[in-house]
């Protein structure tokens, strides 16, 4: 990166060391202890930037249990970094610290598949992306152009389950920005980078039956399994090339 004779350099070794350290921490979305450790590590790492670093509490989220009752679902804190908030031009950079692998999942360790390929939980999705983001910003801050651009960084803790505890925060930070960049790898099979993603919606449906004797008075019963199977088939039939419907837990 060059600007007016100044160059920002990127230390590949430091990037790799951070990815290995971060990926050694289990950050399944429900692992609050692991997420707390990861958030602290990220806060320390992003403190090298000339801005403020804050851990923001998650918004409350209500989930539905199998019996239809509602309960509060806890989440980890989100990392927010603000650099030059008064700048006329500002952008948003986003990522997530959680992974799909819970604390009791067998995939917990990193392995070098060859001299250039590291396999481990969160290495690609997306602790590697967070390292790319951080070191790109560090290099940018070493250029003369940095003073003319402000930015916010958001690393949320609940992306893998739909970002319900961070959606309002994302919207608030995105307001007024010139652009928003997300550092999760999203390449097509031919290597083409995805430039947009479809939205998602999640719904919980509870089926409640009524018991009856299968031989004596079946007409008085209501079979919740049959009702669920019927709805699943009807929902799946609504799919189009633009809409994917996934009836699953």
Language model: regions and residue ranges:
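Acidic/His- and Gly-rich active-site-bordering loop/insert found
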Residues: 2-119, 142
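Buried hydrophobic positions in well-ordered alpha/beta secondary-structure cores of metabolic enzymes
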Residues: 26, 93-96, 133, 153, ...
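Short Gly/Pro-enriched turn/cap motifs at secondary-structure boundaries
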Residues: 69-72, 193-197
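Glycine/serine-rich anion-binding loops at beta->alpha junctions
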Residues: 98, 116-131, 213
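Acidic/histidine-rich catalytic neighborhood of metal-dependent amide-processing enzymes
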Residues: 126-196, 244-247
